[in-house]
């Protein structure tokens, strides 16, 4: 338990040190697609690790996509097309306990058969745009594209 808390604190401090506190962005990114009051921006020509994708989304005032239900999963799959994209899910801090990077409850799941594998180091979540199914993988095993979500501020 102490180890998980220490990892969480270390992660938070590292993120703040590397990127600082970001100012709210008022306008959605160009070419963003709206869904349920949020804006989704795909970077399908940019391969990155999960951490690189997370920080790139942070830098534009967004986050890696968090999927709350089947309708949103299908929406994201259609944007992803034939690409494999990073989602904001991880079990890095406690193996087998999946959480969304933004703190949302990890209720909806759409795992591919045999997933999550639970293999050592497979702590990051990807979505296959062909099927909409999820898989766990390592941060460096697969360089995937990213899809950033920006919450609409009212």
Language model features with spans:
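Extracellular, disulfide-bonded carbohydrate-recognition/adhesion ectodomains
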Residues: 2-8, 19-154
């Amino acid at each position: 338990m102490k180890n998980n808390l220490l990892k969480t604190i270390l992660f938070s401090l590292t993120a703040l040190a590397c990127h600082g506190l970001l100012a709210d962005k008022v306008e959605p990114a160009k070419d963003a697609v709206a869904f349920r009051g949020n804006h989704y921006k795909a970077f399908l020509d940019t391969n990155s690790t999960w951490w690189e994708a997370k920080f790139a989304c942070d830098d534009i005032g967004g986050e890696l996509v968090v999927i709350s239900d089947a309708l949103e999963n299908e929406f994201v799959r259609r944007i992803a097309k034939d690409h494999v994209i990073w989602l904001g899910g991880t079990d890095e801090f406690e193996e087998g306990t999946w959480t969304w990077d933004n703190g949302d409850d990890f209720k909806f799941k759409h795992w591919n058969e045999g997933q999550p594998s639970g293999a050592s180091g497979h702590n990051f979540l990807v979505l296959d745009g062909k099927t909409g199914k999820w898989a766990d993988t390592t941060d460096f095993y697969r360089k995937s594209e990213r899809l950033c979500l920006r919450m609409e501020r009212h």
